[in-house]
Curated annotation (Swiss-Prot):
ANK repeats lie at residues 1-30, 34-63, 67-96, 98-119, 123-152, 156-185, 189-218, 222-252, 253-283, 287-317. This is Putative ankyrin repeat protein FPV245. It comes from Fowlpox virus (strain NVSL). Transmembrane segments: none annotated. InterPro entries: Ankyrin_rpt (IPR002110), Ankyrin_rpt-contain_sf (IPR036770). Disulfide bonds: none annotated. It holds the Pfam family Ank_2. Keywords: ANK repeat, Repeat.
Length: 436
């Protein structure tokens, strides 16, 4: 095909194009420098009549040459609905569909022309996958009207819900779940929607997914749980994802969530939350390091190490410290600040045991009973205790407020908040006293 022919195609003169086809019809499927064909040039003009003319005279709508643009994709890119319909009617190869970044009107044209809404491309992606990636709620709603399947996975094992949770789009996640999206599915890397939400989502999105999943402690292929992800990427969601059955789960390197929290950037608030919820400071990673070893290696901040030591002393007093040699750590014994702090912890616990707060119950019992309720399943004792606590809550709070127990005051206050929630379920008024 000569350059003159291309020039005349782009002129838009139908009669001139007809004359050229009549005189040079045997060249209608010949490419120019293997980069284009008469049909591709005709499509690029945006003139459906010229395109129809070429097809009528034998132009191949599925011209096979990887260097030449795909006719259907070319028509979609220039946004010509008429040419797209014309190509589809004439049997153009639709295996490229769907493609990213198609607007709502073009998708409607394609679907109305007979392409199935759940058509998969070479990567097994559907129109729904791309609409979610584009964060286009209106297109998503339209696709459901055409019967889009919410649970088709692509070659990476990603379901639509995986893409939505990576995009942190609450309304889209909500719609997918309402349409029956599976909340516990995993992609090829073992990531669940909750893994993605914990990594990329805000509190509302994580809570939404959490309300629809029955496995908060799912591990991906490298052993990471949603809680691990939250500690690394999304610390505001840590408390939401804490599950006492999985708080000590390890990844393939033997790291627990507490190990993660102790690596830079280190947040003492996150460490405090994990420890209060029974993160085990005795667990060693694959290199033989427990959390205190990790703290000395990566952080070496007195406040962090003291937080770990306070927990170790308290859990040891409860009788649940699995490795008591932690308190004999060389870095602790050789450091006057830390060894003195361990002594102060023990002294404060003695004082807690002597200080009565409700009948014969001591301040130490405030934590001890909570521990038994939380981890030993002793629910009867806590109910009796809380009924007594309800009448003595003001005095008890005052005792804690005056900071009589500087090391363990936050443990005690948190216990009271937790008790308040339990009492709320029992119909008590204590919840109102502690909710602030």
């Amino acid at each position: 095909m000569s350059v003159d022919w291309r020039t005349e195609i782009y002129s838009g003169d139908i009669s001139l194009v007809e004359k050229l086809i009549k005189n040079k019809g045997n060249c209608i499927n010949i490419s120019v420098e293997e980069t284009t064909t008469p049909l591709i040039d005709a499509i690029r003009t945006g003139n459906a009549k010229i395109v129809e003319l070429f097809i009528k005279h034998g132009a191949q709508v599925n011209h096979v040459n990887t260097k030449i643009p795909n006719p259907l994709l070319t028509a979609i890119k220039i946004g010509s609905h008429d040419i797209v319909k014309l190509l589809l009617i004439n049997g153009v190869d639709t295996s490229i569909l769907p493609v990213p970044c198609i607007n709502k009107e073009m998708i409607k044209t394609i679907l109305d022309s007979g392409v199935k809404v759940n058509t998969k491309n070479a990567k097994s992606k559907t129109f729904l996958h791309y609409a979610i990636k584009n964060n286009d709620l209106e297109v998503i709603k339209m696709l459901f009207e055409y019967g889009a399947d919410v649970n088709i996975k692509d070659d990476n094992g990603c379901y639509p819900i995986h893409i939505a949770t990576r995009s942190n789009s609450y309304e889209i996640i909500k719609l997918l779940l309402e349409k029956g999206a599976y909340a516990n599915v995993k992609d090829n890397y073992g990531n669940s929607p909750l893994h993605n939400a914990a990594k990329y989502g805000d509190y509302a999105c994580i809570k939404l997914v959490l309300d629809h999943t029955n496995n908060i402690s799912n591990k991906c292929n490298n052993g990471v749980t949603p809680l691990h992800n939250a500690i690394l990427y999304n610390r505001s969601a840590v408390e939401l994802l804490i599950n006492n059955r999985s708080i000590n789960d390890t990844d393939v390197d033997g790291y627990t969530p507490l190990h993660y929290a102790l690596q830079p950037p280190c947040s003492i608030d996150i460490i405090d939350i994990l420890l209060y919820n029974n993160a085990d400071i005795s667990i060693k990673d694959n290199n033989g390091r427990n959390p205190i070893d990790t703290a000395f290696k990566y952080i070496n901040r007195d406040s962090v190490i003291k937080e770990l030591l306070a927990n170790a002393v308290l859990i040891n007093e409860v009788g649940k410290l699995k490795d008591t040699t932690i308190l004999e750590h060389k870095e602790i014994k050789d450091n006057t600040v830390f060894s003195n702090f361990v002594y102060e912890c023990n002294e404060e616990i003695k004082k807690m045991k002597k200080t009565k707060c409700v009948g014969d119950y001591s301040m130490f019992d405030v934590y001890m009973i909570r521990y038994k309720h939380k981890y030993d399943g002793n629910k009867d004792s806590i109910k009796d205790y809380l009924r007594c606590l309800d009448d003595n809550s003001t005095r008890m709070l005052k005792t804690i407020d005056i900071n009589e127990f500087p090391i363990y005051s936050m443990y005690l206050v948190r216990c009271l908040y937790e008790y308040g929630n339990i009492l709320k379920e029992m119909g008590s008024c204590i919840h109102n006293r502690y909710k602030k």
